[in-house]
C-alpha cells in the first residue's frame, strides 16, 4: 500500500562506498567547468553594480578600488553525448564527461578556508562535529575487519605546493565513538605511525602483550562501565591486524604496467595525487567504506593562469583513470565519487595593484588571481548507479 511505502526512496540506493576527491583551496570554476564566453568579451570591465548589488566581498579583494572582470585563462571544448563544456586543462576528464554529473549550483556561507572546509567535511563551520566518513562508519558499519572504515590520503599540488594547511580534526569522530575516526595513511616508510613493532619485538610477543592488555582493559570496563575502554581494546586489535593489511594495501609494486600508465607519469611516486588514486581504488576493492583524498594547492590568489595549469595537470589523468578503472572492475556501480573544493573563485581579478589604468595590463600579463567566491561554484560526481 501507499502508506507502507512512504519511507522508501524513489530509487533503491546503490552506493556502498565513497571516494571523496577533495580539492582543497577552492578550484576556479571559471577556468575548469563553467564556460562563460560573455565574460571573456567583458575582460577588463569593472564588475557591474547590477551584479554586485552591494554584496560584501571577501577579505583579500575588499580593499581594491575596482574589480575588473576576467574570463577563462584557457579554452573550452564540448565533450560526449551530453556536450558538456570542459576546459582544455582537463582533457582526460572531458573525455569521460558522460560518466559525470556536474553540479554548478553549489553554495556555501563560509568565505574563508578553514570554516569552509570544515563545513564540507562535517556539515558545520564550527569544529568538533563528526566528519562525513565517521558518520558513514557509524551508520553503515564495517565491510572489512582488517582495515579502518575511514581512510585519509593527502597530496600537495604542483601549482601551489605551499597550500592551505589541513588539520586532523577534519577527519575526526567528534562526539561519536573513537572507533569511527579517520585514519591517515602516509606515503612515508611507516604509512600509519606507531603501527610497526620495535625490531626487538616479535609478532608472537606482541600478541601476548595485547592479550594481557585486553584482560586489564576488560577489568577496567567492568569496574567503570566506560565504553571507550572497549573501543580501545577494539582499536588495539585493529592495529594488530593492520600490521599485515596496511603494508599489503600500500604496496603498488605489483600493479600492471598498463594500470600505472593509465593513471599517468606520477602513478608510482608515493604521496602524489596519482599514487593516492591507485591506493583509493585498492582500498575500495578491500571494501573500505569511505576514502578521503585531499589535494592541496587550489588557492590561486595570484598567478592563476600559471598555477592552475599545474593543479589541473596533477588531477586530470588520475581522476579520469580512477573512474574508468573502477568501472572496468565493476566497482563504479556501487561506489560514489565526489570531486570538488570548499568554494569557487570570483569572476573578477584579484590584483596586486588598485590602479585602474594598470588593471588590463596586469590581466593580460597573467599576473592576476581570483578571490574566494562562496555563492556559486561547481563540483561533480560519478558512479553509484
Regions found by a protein language model. Name each.
Residues 1-385:
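Ligand-binding pockets and gating/stacking loops
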Amino acid at each position: 500500500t501507499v502508506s507502507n511505502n512512504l519511507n522508501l526512496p524513489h530509487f533503491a540506493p546503490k552506493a556502498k562506498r565513497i571516494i571523496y576527491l577533495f580539492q582543497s583551496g577552492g578550484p576556479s570554476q571559471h577556468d575548469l567547468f563553467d564556460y562563460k564566453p560573455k565574460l571573456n568579451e567583458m575582460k577588463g570591465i569593472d564588475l557591474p553594480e547590477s551584479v554586485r548589488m552591494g554584496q560584501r566581498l571577501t577579505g583579500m579583494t575588499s580593499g581594491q578600488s575596482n574589480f575588473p572582470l576576467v574570463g577563462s585563462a584557457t579554452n573550452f571544448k564540448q565533450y560526449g553525448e551530453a556536450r558538456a563544456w570542459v576546459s582544455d586543462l582537463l582533457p582526460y576528464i572531458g573525455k569521460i564527461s558522460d560518466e559525470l554529473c556536474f553540479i554548478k549550483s553549489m553554495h556555501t556561507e563560509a568565505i574563508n578556508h578553514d570554516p569552509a572546509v570544515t563545513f564540507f567535511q562535517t556539515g558545520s563551520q564550527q569544529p568538533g562535529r563528526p566528519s562525513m566518513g565517521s558518520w558513514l562508519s557509524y551508520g553503515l558499519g564495517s565491510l572489512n575487519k582488517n582495515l579502518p572504515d575511514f581512510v585519509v590520503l593527502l597530496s600537495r599540488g604542483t601549482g601551489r605546493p605551499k597550500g592551505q594547511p589541513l588539520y586532523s580534526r577534519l577527519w575526526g569522530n567528534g562526539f561519536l565513538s573513537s572507533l569511527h575516526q579517520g585514519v591517515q595513511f602516509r606515503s612515508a616508510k611507516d604509512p600509519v605511525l606507531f603501527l610497526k613493532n620495535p625490531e626487538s619485538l616479535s609478532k608472537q610477543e606482541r600478541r601476548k602483550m595485547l592479550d594481557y592488555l585486553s584482560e586489564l582493559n576488560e577489568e577496567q570496563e567492568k569496574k567503570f562501565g566506560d565504553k571507550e575502554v572497549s573501543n580501545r581494546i577494539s582499536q588495539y586489535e585493529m592495529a594488530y591486524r593492520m600490521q599485515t593489511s596496511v603494508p599489503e594495501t600500500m604496496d603498488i609494486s605489483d600493479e600492471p604496467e598498463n594500470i600505472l600508465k593509465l593513471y599517468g607519469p606520477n602513478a608510482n611516486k608515493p604521496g602524489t595525487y596519482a599514487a593516492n588514486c591507485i591506493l583509493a581504488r585498492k582500498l575500495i576493492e578491500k571494501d573500505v567504506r569511505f576514502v578521503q583524498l585531499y589535494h592541496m594547492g587550489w588557492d590561486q590568489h595570484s598567478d592563476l593562469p600559471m598555477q592552475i595549469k599545474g593543479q589541473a595537470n596533477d588531477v586530470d589523468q588520475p581522476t579520469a583513470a580512477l573512474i574508468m578503472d573502477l568501472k572496468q572492475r565493476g566497482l563504479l556501480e556501487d561506489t560514489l565519487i565526489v570531486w570538488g573544493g570548499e568554494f569557487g573563485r570570483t569572476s573578477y581579478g584579484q590584483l596586486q595593484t588598485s590602479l585602474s589604468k594598470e588593471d588590463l595590463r596586469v590581466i593580460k600579463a597573467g599576473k592576476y588571481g581570483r578571490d574566494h567566491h562562496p555563492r556559486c561554484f561547481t563540483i561533480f560526481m560519478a558512479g553509484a548507479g
